[in-house]
Amino acid sequence: MFSNAFTDKTVMAELVAKMLWEIKAVHFRADEPYKLSSGMASPVYIDCRKLISYPRIRSAVMDFAAATILRDAGFEQFDVVAGGETAGIPFAAMLAERLGLPMIYVRKAPKGHGRNAQIEGHMPEGARVLVIEDLTTAGGSMFKFIDAIRAAGGIVEHGIALFYYDIFPEARGNMKSKGVDLHYIATWRNVLAVAREQALFDEKTLNEVEAFLNAPLAWSERNGGVGTLAAQ
């Protein structure tokens, strides 16, 4: 169960950013941009899955996730924690343990044989479900799982991402318009702040990353990626 240590939000964000650098889960590469699944060119890349391999770090991050949810959403607002296939599953298990709640996981699509189930585990009709993902950009992937839970009779009004890109100002509003409040611990701006503080890169690289965070689609288009995104 959660230890009830409610660390300040800004401290949590900075610590998670430092942890991500420590385990080399975040990368800056402005001169040879990454190509994201959306088609965007990006000077930044993150692999939150690495967190599960570092017990002390993953424990701290999940304590922060529990604190974020309890403080921002409430103590008695959920009946079930859900993780999306596949990255969200281990984090859902760890968060459910801390919150003292049952856990389910949601497939990207029904498995196509047997019960043809998309949701694994027990979710009562009308259950209030907290959905967790390792990261989200604009919430699109999270809604694939939310829609499946709602179709099966669950109620989803909150989602949490351990890491939120926070590069599209309209993203949280779009999620809110679909009935979901998004909670998160750290963003790219926290990661950039740590990189500047620790002088991890030259000034040109840091400035390119900041330019991307300020205008991601314009930066993408200038660097060979798409300049618009498909509607979420």
From Swiss-Prot:
Annotated positions binding 5-phospho-alpha-D-ribose 1-diphosphate:
R107, K108, K111, H113, E133, D134, L135, T136, T137, A138, G139, G140, S141
Q: Give the GO molecular function terms.
A: magnesium ion binding; orotate phosphoribosyltransferase activity
Any Gene Ontology biological process? 'de novo' UMP biosynthetic process
Name the reaction it catalyses. Answer: orotidine 5'-phosphate + diphosphate = orotate + 5-phospho-alpha-D-ribose 1-diphosphate
The pathway where this protein functions is:
Pyrimidine metabolism; UMP biosynthesis via de novo pathway; UMP from orotate: step 1/2
CDD domains, A to Z: PRTases_typeI (cd06223)
Query: Which cysteines are cross-linked by disulfides?
Result: none
**Class of enzymatic activity (EC top level):** transferase
**UniProt record similarity statement:** Belongs to the purine/pyrimidine phosphoribosyltransferase family. PyrE subfamily.
Instruction: Describe its function.
Output: Catalyzes the transfer of a ribosyl phosphate group from 5-phosphoribose 1-diphosphate to orotate, leading to the formation of orotidine monophosphate (OMP).
HAMAP family xrefs = PyrE
Q: What is this protein called?
A: Orotate phosphoribosyltransferase
What organism is this sequence from? Sinorhizobium fredii (strain NBRC 101917 / NGR234)
Encoding gene (name) = pyrE
